[in-house]
């Protein structure tokens, strides 16, 4: 009888299943690596590359910039990202330091691929001058976004399906 509303409801429920698979898969199969990358300030070079799964991060540069008239200082590192040796983009994670409150805010950099996301966080510099890096590979996260898109389509289809006033037979 009310096919658009039924189909929209079915599509919305199927979308929730896709979102659930994406969330479970991305949390159960995440690959996480925390490491220090040696840095030589005199030559502005890193002593090594950062390896995680089939990804390689190669140091490019770093910068310190003042934002909001010096109220915030941003420490940023720039890396070229490679997957299986092929360049996939550049990541520029940073640490923001609020001068007045001395609070730090970590700003991640993400490269999204069809099957997984490369999530890069710069945590600052240790006493030896090495960069503290936290890198994660989140698989199946794109399923969450695809599921959300399906959910919105399902809601629109279900809402667009007109419901007729029911007649009571006597």
Feature locations, PLM:
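Solvent-exposed, non-transmembrane regions of integral membrane proteins
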Residues: 1-170
């Amino acid at each position: 009888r009310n096919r658009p509303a039924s189909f929209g409801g079915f599509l919305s429920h199927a979308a929730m299943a896709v979102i659930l698979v994406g969330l479970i898969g991305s949390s159960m199969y995440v690959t996480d690596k925390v490491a220090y990358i040696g840095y030589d300030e005199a030559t502005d070079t890193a002593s090594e590359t950062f390896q995680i799964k089939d990804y390689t991060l190669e140091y490019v540069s770093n910068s310190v910039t003042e934002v909001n008239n010096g109220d915030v200082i941003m420490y940023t590192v720039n890396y070229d990202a490679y997957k299986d040796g092929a360049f996939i983009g550049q990541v520029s994670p940073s640490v923001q330091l609020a001068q007045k409150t001395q609070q730090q805010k970590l700003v991640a950099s993400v490269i999204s691929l069809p099957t997984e996301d490369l999530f890069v966080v710069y945590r600052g510099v240790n006493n030896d001058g090495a960069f503290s890096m936290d890198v994660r590979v989140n698989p199946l996260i794109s399923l969450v976004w695809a599921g959300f898109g399906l959910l919105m389509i399902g809601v629109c289809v279900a809402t667009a399906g007109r419901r007729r006033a029911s007649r009571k037979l006597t």
